[in-house]
A protein has these predicted regions:
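Glycosyltransferase specificity loop/lid
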Residues: 1-149, 154, 236, 252-303, ...
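Catalytic-core helical/loop segments in enzymes performing group transfer/polymerization on anionic/lipid-linked
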Residues: 8-9, 29, 36, 165, ...
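Short, charged beta->alpha transition segments
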Residues: 91, 168, 211-213
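Anionic group-transfer/hydrolysis microenvironments
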Residues: 108, 184, 228
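Active-site-proximal region of nucleotide-activated glycan assembly enzymes
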Residues: 122-191, 196-197
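Donor-nucleotide binding loops and adjacent catalytic segments primarily
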Residues: 189-288
Length: 386
């Protein structure tokens, strides 16, 4: 039988990036991988050794400045549903002709869930963030979702039901697959001991992305500042960072594609501002990370033992930031009313805290011991052999 696995991801860096080292590891073991996601991720997908199966990829890049509203977040869920509705006919036909043995899909992907169910392939859910079950849900702390979110979830359920799937889902808790690969270590997952053997907590694999991208580290540890790739249209935040850290040690600041560097004003001499940095390479040399607390960025920081100053921009990031603070791995700041003094004080605090340093060292060991891409590939192969 052809050793063929389909991967299906949402068209967002935080969802695609954690899966690519797993793809590369499976390719190294002789598997043929077809990867379903937006065409703009083609170069990264093909570099991992997979063949791209392109979709429309409708997820937006994020809203403009200002706090995210429930309507904006609901819009993201609606885009996931619309992308699945448009993509499923072509994707199903592609894999009818070229069936996979397994479908490894992002847990939020309707396309992946439907493809696994309708092809009869082994289903493997990929979770770039926390897992949830009836006993442990990090998202339960957020409270009852607003009506806009509930309406978007109902639309998801209707599409799943139209393909014959049992759509028992609610915000923050998705039906598990027969195998669920979670890209966080068990020590970071709330209530990890409440999950059964369908779950594998494998942590991240940032060392697979350590290409320096042309960046040369300075002679002393760098402060890294980034709000990720989606919710980063925050020029006021970046100007506050100029005020907080200008004139000090070296700073690497990633502002994304929507913020024009020229619009930020005078750039301090010690600050290197770019749309993008090779994040794992920078974190290897970082003293601290001022971050949006996206799970991918959080995991990469912990892999390298870097303390976090979390400035979350949306609900999922708030959950991650709260967990970081609970475990003594960094601090969480409220983005509303944030000042340069707040930022400077937070960075000074996390870099001087001996107890935090010890907690980071323990979590770095745990994160590296979780197994990463090798453990994920082992779990997928073992599941296919059952």
């Amino acid at each position: 039988m052809d050793r063929h696995i389909a991967f299906v991801s949402l068209p967002a860096h935080g969802h695609v990036n954690p899966t690519l080292p797993v793809v590369a590891e499976l390719v190294r073991r002789g598997w043929r991988i077809s990867y379903v996601t937006a065409e703009r991720f083609g170069p990264e997908v093909e570099k991992s050794g997979a063949t791209l199966v392109p979709t429309a990829g409708r997820l937006p890049g994020g809203p403009g400045p200002g706090r995210l509203s429930p309507a904006v977040l609901a819009g993201f869920l609606e885009r996931i549903t619309a992308d699945a509705r448009d993509s499923l006919p072509g994707v199903r036909e592609h894999f009818r002709v070229d069936p996979p043995q397994a479908v490894c899909y992002d847990a939020m992907s309707i396309t992946g869930r439907v493809l696994a169910a309708t092809t009869g392939a082994v289903d493997v859910a990929l979770l770039p963030s926390f897992a949830s079950n009836e006993r442990s849900s990090a998202f339960a702390r957020v409270g009852t979702p607003p009506p806009e979110i509930l309406a978007a979830v109902r639309d998801m359920k209707e599409l799943l039901t139209s393909y014959g799937l049992d759509a028992q889902m609610r915000p923050g808790m998705l039906p598990p697959a027969s195998l669920n690969v979670v890209f966080v270590p068990p020590e970071f997952q709330p209530g990890a001991d409440t999950f059964d053997d369908r779950y594998r907590f494998v942590g991240p694999s940032p060392s697979a992305r350590e290409d320096d991208g042309g960046w040369t580290p300075p002679d002393e540890p760098v402060l890294f500042v980034s709000l990720g790739t989606a919710f980063n249209d925050r020029p006021g935040f970046f100007r506050a960072c100029f005020a907080a850290f200008g004139g000090g040690g070296p700073v690497a600041m990633a502002v994304g594609e929507r913020v024009l560097i020229d619009d930020l004003g005078a750039v301090p001499a010690n600050v290197d501002v770019r749309p993008w940095f090779p994040q794992p390479a920078v974190l290897r040399h970082a003293a601290a990370f001022v971050s949006h607390a996206g799970m991918g960025s959080t995991m990469e920081a912990l892999y390298y033992g870097v303390p976090l100053v979390c400035v979350p921009q949306m609900v999922e990031q708030e959950v991650n930031a709260t967990r970081v603070a609970e475990l003594g791995l960094g601090v969480r700041l409220d983005p509303e009313g944030l000042t340069a003094d707040d930022l400077r004080a937070a960075v000074d605090a996390v870099t001087a805290d001996a107890a935090m340093r010890a907690a980071l060292d323990r979590m770095r060991t745990a994160t590296r011991s979780a197994g990463g891409a090798v453990a994920a590939a082992d779990a997928i192969e073992a599941h296919l052999a059952v």
